[in-house]
Amino acid sequence: MSKDIYIEIKDRNTFLQYLKENTGVMLFKFKASWCKPCKMIHDDVDKYFEMTNDNVTCFDIDIDEYSDVYKFLKSRKMVNGVPSILGYLKPNDTFVPDFSFSGTDKRQLKVFFDKINLVSNTNL
């Protein structure tokens, strides 16, 4: 059975509400259809998303379709381009991520997901 991956967040208020209601770990990948680096890591990220624990909720957000959250986070220097993945532990009342990844380095991508799997295995 494949893991549900959510592809939309309407606005920053919805994003902040998700963080407040988080019961485990939330991952938000920001991408764009025109972004070549995003395409370079796409398959790897999908594979890692599938391998995350049940208490990890994954979002795969196209910044051209759902730009409000991306612009909000960029204005606060939480992301500075795509591809970027932000990880949040429960509960989080701010927009500051607990973990982040940016770029195309596949070794660092694996390290990022290893950390996510490690913390999601603990009693959050």
Regions found by a protein language model. Give the residues of each.
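Non-catalytic, surface beta->alpha helical segment in thiol-disulfide oxidoreductase systems
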Residues: 80-81, 86-124
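Residue-level detector of flexible, active-site-proximal loop/helix-junction positions
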Residues: 13, 34, 63-65, 92, ...
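N-terminal leader/targeting and pre-domain segments
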Residues: 1-26, 107-124
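Hydrophobic beta-strand anchors of alpha/beta hydrolase catalytic cores
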Residues: 26-28, 58, 85
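Mid-chain, well-packed structural core segment of small domains
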Residues: 68-81
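Local sequence-structure signature of Cys/Sec-based thiol-disulfide redox active-site neighborhoods
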Residues: 16-50
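Thiol-based oxidoreductase modules, predominantly thioredoxin-like and allied folds used
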Residues: 6-11, 30, 42-49, 53-70
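Eukaryotic short linear interaction motifs
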Residues: 36-37, 66-69, 94, 107-110
